[in-house]
Each structure stands twice: as C-alpha cells, then as structure tokens.
Amino acid sequence: MKEFYQMTSQEAKIAINGSEAPLTEEQVAANRERYGPNALAEGKKKSVAQIFLEQFKDFLVVILIIAAIVSGVLGDFESAAVILIVITLNAVLGTVQTVKAEQSLDSLKKMSAPEAKVLRNGQFVKIPSAEITVGDLVSLEAGDFVPADGRIVENAGLKVDESALTGESLGVDKDSRAIEGEAPLGDRLCMVYSGSFVTYGRGEFLVTSIGMETEVGKIATLLSTTKEKRTPLQMNLDNFGKKLSILILVFCGILFGISVLRGEAIGDAFLFAVALAVAAIPEALSSIVTIVLSFGTQKMAREHAIIRKLQAVEGLGSVSVICSDKTGTLTQNKMTVEDYYVHGRKIKADDIDLNNPEEMQLLLTSMLCNDSSIAEGKELGDPTETALINIGSKLGVSYETERAACSRVGEIPFDSDRKLMSTCNRISGERAAFFERAEKSDAAEGQDWMLTKGAVDVLLDRVTKIQTSGGVREITERDKAEIAACNQSFSENGLRVLAFAYKKIEEGLVPQLDDEQDLVFLGLISMMDPPREESKAAVAECIRAGIKPVMITGDHKVTAAAIAKKIGILKDESEACEGASIDGMTDEELREHVDHISVYARVSPEHKIRIVRAWQDKGNIVAMTGDGVNDAPALKQADIGVAMGITGTEVSKDASSMILTDDNFATIVKAVENGRNLYKNIKYAIQFLLSGNFGAILVVLFASVFALPVPFAPVHLLFINLLTDSLPAIALGLEPHRKELMNEKPRPADESILTGEFLARIGAGGVSICVMTTVAFLIGYHGWFTAADLGGSALLGSTMAFGTLCVSRLFHGFNCKSDRPVVFTRKVWNNKWLIGAFVLGMILITLAIACPGLDHVFKVQTLGLPQLMTVYGLAFLNIPVIQLVKAIRERVAAR
C-alpha cells in the first residue's frame, strides 16, 4: 500500500473512509472506538519519594549508611546522627535538582490544539481536539495549531511552521498534489503534522493518524523508551566508592590482624577496626561534590547555560563529540540579504548604489512586493520578506515611507503551486522615474505597475524582456542561461534565491493569474541565515580541545554544507550526508562511517538517536543540541542534552540536561571548559579529603603497632571531617579556571578518579601529614620539649596530634591547588575562598585546643603558647615537603 503522501486526496479518502464522502455520525463513533482518543498516552512517572530514595543508590552512600548503623551499634550515637544528617541533606539536594526531569510527555500534551474545526453533518464545527478521529476533515487557517496528522485535500496558500518537528527554520509552503517515490518528513508537502503551526493561508486536511500514531506520538514513544545515560562523574564516584571501601577494608583488616597478634580479644579488635573504618570515610564528600557542582551551575547560569541536572556540569568536561543543530545555534536564526544580481552583475548587499536606477528599482520592488512589517521592534511575516525590508532600512530606505508613497491597489497572494506573488502598486513622484526610465517613456503621476517575485525557474518562464543599464530589451536565451548560472552559484553556496520582475498595467486593473505574463526581468536577491560571529572561533576551540563538532539539521544538504564550511566544521563535501543515506546503513555500518561524517541533513528523530548511539558505542561522551519536539529523544539519549532557551520547545527543554539562554554554540564550548575545570577542582577536593583521612589512618595504625594509646577521640575526627575539612574542600572546588585545559584532549569516559598518579599524590600527602602528626603525638605523650610542670600524658599527646592533624590538613589545602609546585608563587593567593576557609579553620581549631572551658567538649587538654607553636610549626612543614615532592616529580617527568 502506498503512503498517504503518495496518494491523491481522492485515493486517501477512499483508503480511509471507503468513499470520498465525509464521515457519517456512525462512522465517527466506530472510528473513535477503533482508534481511541486523539491524545498522547500517559507515561509512568516517578514520585518524589522514589526520586528521593534513588539518591541512596550510590555505593559510597551505602557505605556511609552502613557506617552510621555500625556507629550506632557501637554506642557512638553522635557520629551516627551526623553521618545520617549529612547523607539526608545530600539526598534532598539531589531530589530538588531532578524532581522535574520527567516532564517531557506533559509538554507534548501542551502542544496539542485544544479545539479544532471539523466537518460534521455538512458543516464545520469546533470540537475538542481529543475528539478528532481518523477520517475526519479538518479546516485550517493562519494561527491554528494542527491537531492531528493528515493529507491536505484543499490548499489556498497554506504555509506551516514545522520547525519543532523537522528543525527547518523557514515555513513550509504546502501543496495538495501527491508525491512520487519516497520522501523525508520535511519534503512531504501534501501532509500536515500534529503540533505544527499554520502561519499563512488556509486549507483542509483528511486526518490519517491521531494520538500515539502521529509523528509527535512516535516521538513520545521514543522519549519514553529512551534510557538516560549516567554521567562520567556518576560512574566515577560509584567506582571510586567501591575502590575506596576496598582500601579501607584492607587497612582495617591489617589493623585487626595486628591487634589480634598483640593478644587483644577478637571482639575488641573487631570493634576497633570498624571504628577506624567509620573514621576513614569522608562523610562530607557527597555533599561537598554536590555543593561544588551547585556553585558551578550558578557560574554557568551567568554565562547563559542553565543546568537542569546537576551531574551534567561535570559531564560536560568529558564531552568528545558535540552534535549541534544549525539554525539559531551555529547561525543567527535571522534571514539576511547577501547579494543582488542586477543589470548582469553580482553586487554585495551593503554595496547597493541608491543613485543607480536599476539597483534602486530592485530594492524598491523587493520592499513593495512584500507583506512583512516591523511593529514595536518585532518582525512580523515571513523571514525572507523581513530580510528584504531590513536591508532597505540598513541602507536608509524606509519600507513604511515607500509603501505610503506607492500604495498597493491590488494583489495576487503567494501560492505554493505557482510559487509566485504579485502586487499592483500605484507609483508616483521620484519613484515613478525609476520605472518610467526603464520603459523609456515620460514619467507619469500615479501609474500602476505589477511587481512580481518568486522562484527563479518559474519566473524565467514568464518574462519576455530584461532590465539593463541601457533600458529594457527582449530577453535572450543567453540572458536566461546567465541568470540560471547565477542562481545555481547562489544555491550551491546555500543561499535562498528570489527572482523579481515587473510590468506596466492599466490603471484600475484587477490583477488575475493570467496577468503574470510578459514580465520584465529585474534581478535576483540571495539570502541566508548567516553564521554567528562567534561560531567559527568556537568550532576552532572545539577542535583544539579534541572535540569533534557535528552539524545535524533538518535543512537541505547544500545549505547545511555551506554554513558548515564557513565555520570550519566541514572540510570536504564527502563529509556531508542526508537522512536517506543513514536509512541505507546498518548500525554497524553507521559506526564505521560516523567518524568521517561532519554534517547530517534532512534527518528524522530516529536518525538522530542512531547517530548519537553510534558515537557512544565508540566510547565517546556526546553532547546533543536541539530545540524541537523531534530533538527530545536524542537529547535524552545523549550523555549531555542541550536545549535552546529562546527557540526551544518545552518538550526539548524537559528532555535536556542543560538549557542555553542565548541559543549559542559558543556557550556550549564555554560550558565544556567549565566542566573540565570543575572536574579538575573536584579531584583536588577529593585529593585533599583523602590525603587527610589517609594520614589519620596511618597515625592510628602506627599507634596500634607500637602499642600506644589511640591518638584521636571520635569527636576529633568528626570535628575535622565536618568543620575544618569541608570548607577548604569546597574552596578547592571553586579554584579559578585554567584556560590551558582546553588545549588537552577529553579524558576517557571510563577513566577512574583513583588513577595511579592520583593515588601517589594522596599517599604522599597522607604520609607527610602522618609524620608531622605522629611527631606531635609523641612530643605530647612523652612530654618532650614541654615545661616540667606540664609533663607528658596520653591526653596531651592526643590534643597535640588532633591540633597538628587539623592544621596540617588546612595547610595541605594549598598543596592541593595544583598538580605543579605553585605554593611559593603568586598563584597561592588567587583563591579568596581557600584563604577564607584556612583562616576560619585556624580560628576554630585554635579555640578548640587553646580556649579554657572547651576542653571537656572536645576531649582535649588546653594548650599553652609553646605547644601551640609546636603544633603550628609541625603542621606548616607539610607545605615545603609536598612542594619538594612535586618539584622532584616534575623534574623526573621532564627527562
């Protein structure tokens, strides 16, 4: 059976209704029973409670919950309560960020027309769009939403905006004639689709599909079956949590074995090992990562990128492929006049000579044979027509003034079948001289002229004369060949071309279609939606950063390729293909070719998903931009879905991870830079936290091996983890951005946070902190270098160890600022948040160990000035030690 767009309107009626007659009431009822309501199916939604519970799936969070339970069993209710509060707060933050992530189907429903004009009992009546059924005849006019998919049976200049479905920016001129052969969605001119919008004309269509069977319904099905990808950070943190738990268990196992060998009871040894495991886990890590990402979202929002899903902030830093829409993202989304072809030569739009009669005549004609206007700064009408009046304004010629002086006395509206538009204007005064001069006759006041514009091939068949600098003469085949060649040249460069002609008519003549003959050819005007000024630089930065930019558009291949060449995405024509080519490829073949294709034109939603999957199957992290309903499934399939804030539909926004408030490709590149920096900063924060915890574990291990008292009370470790550690860790997450990161290739998606080099840094920091803390503990425990009356004690040793561990970690924050030795350079001062966190941390720890009255709260012995100086001095040594290690590592690596 033929597709409906391949059938005539009569064949379509017979195929659906069995005859050309409208549906009877009985047939309407039967069809409603058979096809159901014209509505999208309800998708299963997650409740807020489900979303909240999902926040506890991360492995590290599970470990923390177990740690809290163990702490409670051991009687350490303080630790258990703090841990549970921290992970609950983190879950609340995550829930707030994701609670709106599944609204796509709701937005699709909003696109449906609430009412439609349908033929019932021989008359068109308004009914709710949900009551429309297959076989109904629906009337459309300008301003209507199309309520269902259907075959056009009557067309009077119908123009439909299908950009939400096809991605094509310009309105589509509809045609009631059948189409031969296969045609992509955007080229099925005799069809209309649910969710599109009528911008001009009127028509009637036969409903062929409703509800989930419409093109929008198919997209809804794709959207509901498309699984969201986990971001690299989500996978990394999960992997990190598993590895961290294994490391902690290994250490605790060692400690348990040592304790048993020393003769301690197995039960006591086990409880001590579990307590150490609780202390080793960085309780605030999840919250710190969430807070750092939240700060990142605020910065990106100021730079026109709104993050809807928090983990996407970091995921941007892993992006290796950006699949971008063309219109409005890489281009300005505004048609602009590029060239004129008049009296046999091409002229750039800005170079029009207003004193040249032929050039001025073409400019006037384009503004008069034109229905667009500008009201309160808003352009009204077809984009190609607004481009024609905008260039006039730019050159100092007001369309309002010209239209007032050259009143329209008649018109033949544009018709997609004949592809022409004509107006009859009464032209007088100075303007009449341009036309009368062309006709080599005396100027006459109030002469009527027919001005015609349209497709080049159609207009050339209707002209018999041509305007030249020497006047009007008969047009020759050579003239037509030159005009056709110029049109071909414009088209090959992705330009949209209109031809203009005119002729003198009798005063008061009511124009008829037959009058569009024997015209005088005046010239051509080419237009395009030009690239954004910043697109070329942004594409170049992508390539430098090892990111592959890919254009995916519903527009024609020639237009897409021309833009892609201008901005650097496309170097060779072989790198461009159309959706029909993808249909001929298996998924495996597409994976093989995807590296070599930079431009995809005339693509469907299914094509977009296949393209994204092909890149993902090759191990890439893919960002996908889109603004239409047709983009939503691919946005959801992509690792990072990027919706347009200005032109984007609610559907695309709800399916996305990020929304661009300026619809600008350069903003995506800036967001990638932010993502890379945030990932680096999060690693610095993790390095800072784990170095300190590792140092604490080593100190406890040392004390256990040598049968010394436990150096730390539980309150000490909680104080450090939740107070003096959290703020520096957050501050490290706010380190200033480093532009040089955009000179590096994207990191592999499966790269673990805990690389060998990263573990070495954690180890070096932990050992350094351990040494300084152990020395402080021994000084206090044995009473070395202390006043005789103070003496040594386990409590003093514990206090000095606590103070040194805390201050060492505060100083270590400066070590973690960079992989390079920068502490003794000016860069140490470039993070005001870290300096503030250091100062606050120093105040808090000093109060805890030196303020009388707080000793019982923190289980310490109040220190005097000598002991304080010892603590500060030992802690500071951590900086030169780690900086020396970095310098040695850097020198070795340089060899």
What is the meaning of each model-derived region?
Residues 749-767, 792-800:
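Membrane-water interface at loop-to-transmembrane-helix junctions
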Residues 816:
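A C-terminal functional module that forms or caps the active site or interfaces directly
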Residues 724, 798-813:
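Generic alpha-helical transmembrane segments
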Residues 704-713, 779-797:
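Helix-coil boundary and interhelical linker segments in multi-pass alpha-helical membrane proteins
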Residues 774-786, 850-855:
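Membrane-helix interface motif
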Residues 769, 773, 807-810:
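ATP/pyrophosphate-binding catalytic subdomain of soluble kinases
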Residues 1-743, 753-754, 767, 802, ...:
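Conserved cytosolic headpiece of P-type ATPases
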